[in-house]
Amino acid sequence: MNKQALSDFIRQEMSGWKPFEVLLLVFCVGAQLLLLIQTSAPLLDAISGITGTICVVLVSKGKISNYFFGLIFAYTYFYVAWHQNYIGEMNSVLYIYLPAQFIGYFLWKANMQKDNAGSEEVVAKALDFKGWAILLVSLTVFTLLFIEALKAAGGSSTSLDGVTTITTCAAQLLMILRYREQWLLWIVLNVLSILLWWEENPSMRVMYIAYLVNSIYGFYNWTKLQKQLKA
Protein backbone atom coordinates (compact mmCIF):
# COMPACT_ATOMS: atom_id res chain seq x y z
CA MET A 1 0.00 0.00 0.00
CA ASN A 2 1.57 3.34 -1.10
CA LYS A 3 1.40 6.57 0.90
CA GLN A 4 -1.55 7.96 -1.06
CA ALA A 5 -3.57 4.76 -0.67
CA LEU A 6 -2.76 4.67 3.04
CA SER A 7 -3.80 8.32 3.40
CA ASP A 8 -7.09 7.65 1.59
CA PHE A 9 -7.77 4.61 3.76
CA ILE A 10 -7.19 6.54 7.00
CA ARG A 11 -9.38 9.40 5.77
CA GLN A 12 -12.12 6.92 4.89
CA GLU A 13 -11.96 5.21 8.28
CA MET A 14 -12.14 8.52 10.14
CA SER A 15 -15.12 9.84 8.17
CA GLY A 16 -18.69 9.77 9.43
CA TRP A 17 -17.87 10.04 13.16
CA LYS A 18 -20.47 11.70 15.39
CA PRO A 19 -19.33 13.96 18.27
CA PHE A 20 -20.45 11.35 20.83
CA GLU A 21 -18.39 8.66 19.12
CA VAL A 22 -15.28 10.84 19.14
CA LEU A 23 -15.85 11.63 22.83
CA LEU A 24 -16.32 7.92 23.55
CA LEU A 25 -13.00 7.09 21.91
CA VAL A 26 -11.19 9.94 23.71
CA PHE A 27 -12.73 8.97 27.05
CA CYS A 28 -11.84 5.30 26.72
CA VAL A 29 -8.24 5.91 25.65
CA GLY A 30 -7.83 8.76 28.14
CA ALA A 31 -8.93 6.53 31.01
CA GLN A 32 -6.23 4.04 30.10
CA LEU A 33 -3.53 6.71 29.90
CA LEU A 34 -4.57 8.22 33.23
CA LEU A 35 -4.45 4.83 34.89
CA LEU A 36 -0.99 4.21 33.46
CA ILE A 37 0.28 7.44 35.01
CA GLN A 38 -1.39 6.89 38.39
CA THR A 39 -0.51 3.25 38.94
CA SER A 40 2.70 2.87 36.93
CA ALA A 41 1.04 -0.07 35.20
CA PRO A 42 3.35 -2.28 33.11
CA LEU A 43 3.82 -1.03 29.56
CA LEU A 44 2.43 -4.25 28.09
CA ASP A 45 -0.77 -3.84 30.13
CA ALA A 46 -1.14 -0.28 28.89
CA ILE A 47 -0.58 -1.21 25.23
CA SER A 48 -3.10 -4.03 25.55
CA GLY A 49 -5.67 -1.78 27.20
CA ILE A 50 -5.30 1.10 24.73
CA THR A 51 -5.26 -0.96 21.53
CA GLY A 52 -8.12 -3.11 22.77
CA THR A 53 -10.18 -0.02 23.52
CA ILE A 54 -9.52 1.53 20.10
CA CYS A 55 -10.39 -1.80 18.48
CA VAL A 56 -13.82 -2.18 20.09
CA VAL A 57 -14.79 1.44 19.40
CA LEU A 58 -13.95 0.88 15.73
CA VAL A 59 -16.02 -2.32 15.75
CA SER A 60 -19.00 -0.43 17.17
CA LYS A 61 -18.64 1.96 14.22
CA GLY A 62 -18.46 -0.95 11.78
CA LYS A 63 -14.96 0.12 10.67
CA ILE A 64 -12.72 -2.55 9.16
CA SER A 65 -9.58 -0.92 10.61
CA ASN A 66 -10.51 -2.48 13.96
CA TYR A 67 -8.61 -5.59 12.90
CA PHE A 68 -5.24 -3.80 12.88
CA PHE A 69 -5.63 -2.73 16.51
CA GLY A 70 -7.21 -6.07 17.38
CA LEU A 71 -4.09 -7.86 16.23
CA ILE A 72 -1.85 -5.79 18.51
CA PHE A 73 -4.29 -6.31 21.39
CA ALA A 74 -4.33 -10.07 20.90
CA TYR A 75 -0.55 -10.40 21.09
CA THR A 76 -0.17 -8.22 24.18
CA TYR A 77 -3.23 -9.55 26.02
CA PHE A 78 -1.93 -13.09 25.68
CA TYR A 79 1.11 -12.25 27.81
CA VAL A 80 -0.98 -10.30 30.34
CA ALA A 81 -3.27 -13.32 30.83
CA TRP A 82 -0.24 -15.63 30.96
CA HIS A 83 1.18 -13.61 33.85
CA GLN A 84 -2.10 -14.12 35.79
CA ASN A 85 -2.33 -17.84 34.89
CA TYR A 86 -5.72 -17.37 33.22
CA ILE A 87 -5.52 -20.42 30.99
CA GLY A 88 -8.93 -19.91 29.45
CA GLU A 89 -8.14 -16.33 28.47
CA MET A 90 -4.81 -17.42 26.98
CA ASN A 91 -6.53 -20.08 24.89
CA SER A 92 -9.19 -17.63 23.73
CA VAL A 93 -6.46 -15.32 22.43
CA LEU A 94 -4.39 -18.05 20.80
CA TYR A 95 -7.22 -19.96 19.15
CA ILE A 96 -9.95 -17.30 18.79
CA TYR A 97 -8.71 -13.69 18.82
CA LEU A 98 -5.64 -14.14 16.62
CA PRO A 99 -7.26 -16.22 13.84
CA ALA A 100 -10.37 -14.01 13.97
CA GLN A 101 -8.36 -10.90 13.06
CA PHE A 102 -7.38 -12.40 9.71
CA ILE A 103 -10.62 -14.24 8.95
CA GLY A 104 -12.77 -11.30 10.02
CA TYR A 105 -10.86 -8.82 7.89
CA PHE A 106 -11.50 -10.70 4.65
CA LEU A 107 -15.15 -11.47 5.51
CA TRP A 108 -15.81 -7.82 6.33
CA LYS A 109 -13.88 -6.61 3.29
CA ALA A 110 -16.36 -8.39 1.04
CA ASN A 111 -19.39 -6.96 2.87
CA MET A 112 -19.00 -3.20 3.25
CA GLN A 113 -21.54 -0.48 2.44
CA LYS A 114 -21.50 3.33 2.29
CA ASP A 115 -23.85 5.45 4.37
CA ASN A 116 -25.47 8.72 3.30
CA ALA A 117 -22.30 10.66 4.15
CA GLY A 118 -20.16 8.34 2.03
CA SER A 119 -18.54 6.66 5.03
CA GLU A 120 -17.81 2.94 4.55
CA GLU A 121 -19.26 0.62 7.21
CA VAL A 122 -19.92 -3.10 7.51
CA VAL A 123 -23.21 -4.68 6.39
CA ALA A 124 -24.84 -5.90 9.63
CA LYS A 125 -27.20 -8.88 10.06
CA ALA A 126 -29.58 -10.11 12.80
CA LEU A 127 -30.21 -13.60 14.20
CA ASP A 128 -33.58 -15.27 13.62
CA PHE A 129 -35.32 -17.58 16.13
CA LYS A 130 -33.42 -20.66 14.95
CA GLY A 131 -30.13 -18.81 15.24
CA TRP A 132 -30.90 -17.78 18.82
CA ALA A 133 -31.81 -21.37 19.77
CA ILE A 134 -28.54 -22.74 18.37
CA LEU A 135 -26.57 -19.99 20.11
CA LEU A 136 -28.08 -20.53 23.58
CA VAL A 137 -27.79 -24.32 23.50
CA SER A 138 -24.20 -24.14 22.26
CA LEU A 139 -23.23 -21.62 24.94
CA THR A 140 -24.62 -23.79 27.72
CA VAL A 141 -23.09 -27.08 26.59
CA PHE A 142 -19.63 -25.77 25.71
CA THR A 143 -19.37 -23.65 28.85
CA LEU A 144 -20.02 -26.64 31.14
CA LEU A 145 -17.53 -28.79 29.24
CA PHE A 146 -14.84 -26.12 29.21
CA ILE A 147 -15.13 -25.40 32.94
CA GLU A 148 -14.41 -29.06 33.65
CA ALA A 149 -11.41 -28.94 31.30
CA LEU A 150 -10.04 -25.86 33.11
CA LYS A 151 -10.41 -27.55 36.49
CA ALA A 152 -8.46 -30.54 35.22
CA ALA A 153 -5.72 -28.20 33.92
CA GLY A 154 -5.40 -26.41 37.27
CA GLY A 155 -6.40 -22.95 36.05
CA SER A 156 -7.36 -19.94 38.21
CA SER A 157 -11.00 -18.77 38.63
CA THR A 158 -12.12 -21.71 36.50
CA SER A 159 -15.89 -21.07 36.54
CA LEU A 160 -15.69 -17.38 35.67
CA ASP A 161 -12.78 -17.94 33.30
CA GLY A 162 -14.70 -20.71 31.54
CA VAL A 163 -17.84 -18.63 31.08
CA THR A 164 -15.92 -15.64 29.72
CA THR A 165 -13.89 -17.78 27.33
CA ILE A 166 -16.87 -19.54 25.73
CA THR A 167 -18.84 -16.29 25.60
CA THR A 168 -15.85 -14.68 23.90
CA CYS A 169 -15.76 -17.48 21.31
CA ALA A 170 -19.45 -17.02 20.51
CA ALA A 171 -19.27 -13.22 20.42
CA GLN A 172 -16.17 -13.27 18.23
CA LEU A 173 -17.85 -15.67 15.80
CA LEU A 174 -20.93 -13.46 15.60
CA MET A 175 -18.67 -10.47 15.06
CA ILE A 176 -16.77 -11.86 12.08
CA LEU A 177 -20.10 -13.10 10.64
CA ARG A 178 -21.48 -9.54 11.12
CA TYR A 179 -24.38 -10.27 13.51
CA ARG A 180 -25.53 -7.41 15.74
CA GLU A 181 -26.36 -9.85 18.58
CA GLN A 182 -22.63 -10.08 19.24
CA TRP A 183 -23.09 -6.92 21.31
CA LEU A 184 -25.49 -8.56 23.74
CA LEU A 185 -22.86 -11.21 24.39
CA TRP A 186 -20.14 -8.55 24.67
CA ILE A 187 -22.23 -6.77 27.32
CA VAL A 188 -22.47 -9.97 29.37
CA LEU A 189 -18.82 -10.75 28.74
CA ASN A 190 -17.63 -7.31 29.77
CA VAL A 191 -19.53 -7.45 33.07
CA LEU A 192 -17.99 -10.86 33.81
CA SER A 193 -14.53 -9.69 32.74
CA ILE A 194 -14.74 -6.70 35.09
CA LEU A 195 -15.32 -9.18 37.91
CA LEU A 196 -12.50 -11.41 36.69
CA TRP A 197 -9.90 -8.63 36.69
CA TRP A 198 -11.29 -6.53 39.59
CA GLU A 199 -8.66 -7.48 42.15
CA GLU A 200 -5.84 -8.51 39.85
CA ASN A 201 -5.19 -5.79 37.29
CA PRO A 202 -6.47 -2.17 37.38
CA SER A 203 -5.58 -1.52 33.73
CA MET A 204 -7.64 -4.47 32.53
CA ARG A 205 -10.50 -3.45 34.84
CA VAL A 206 -10.67 0.05 33.36
CA MET A 207 -10.39 -1.38 29.86
CA TYR A 208 -13.41 -3.63 30.36
CA ILE A 209 -15.48 -0.84 31.91
CA ALA A 210 -14.78 1.16 28.75
CA TYR A 211 -15.70 -1.93 26.72
CA LEU A 212 -19.04 -2.17 28.55
CA VAL A 213 -19.98 1.41 27.70
CA ASN A 214 -18.92 0.86 24.09
CA SER A 215 -20.78 -2.45 23.76
CA ILE A 216 -24.05 -0.80 24.78
CA TYR A 217 -23.52 1.83 22.10
CA GLY A 218 -22.37 -0.86 19.67
CA PHE A 219 -25.69 -2.68 19.89
CA TYR A 220 -27.52 0.58 19.24
CA ASN A 221 -25.37 1.49 16.24
CA TRP A 222 -25.40 -1.99 14.69
CA THR A 223 -29.18 -2.07 15.00
CA LYS A 224 -29.19 1.05 12.83
CA LEU A 225 -26.75 -0.54 10.38
CA GLN A 226 -28.95 -3.64 10.14
CA LYS A 227 -32.04 -1.52 9.49
CA GLN A 228 -30.17 0.28 6.71
CA LEU A 229 -29.65 -3.10 5.04
CA LYS A 230 -33.35 -3.97 5.35
CA ALA A 231 -34.26 -0.60 3.88
Regions found by a protein language model. Give the residues of each.
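Membrane-helix interface "capping/anchor" motifs
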Residues: 57-69, 173-185
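Hydrophobic/aromatic-rich structural module bridging two neighboring secondary-structure elements via a short loop
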Residues: 59-107
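Membrane-proximal helix-loop-helix units in multi-pass membrane proteins
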Residues: 92, 96-164
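Helix-coil boundary and interhelical linker segments in multi-pass alpha-helical membrane proteins
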Residues: 38-40, 79-90, 149-157, 198-203
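C-terminal transmembrane-bundle signature of multipass membrane proteins
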Residues: 175-231
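Short, hydrophobic transmembrane alpha-helix segments
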Residues: 31-43, 60-62
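Alpha-helical transmembrane segments
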Residues: 18-31, 48, 137-140
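Short, Lys/Arg-rich, polar N-terminal cytosolic tail immediately upstream
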Residues: 1-15
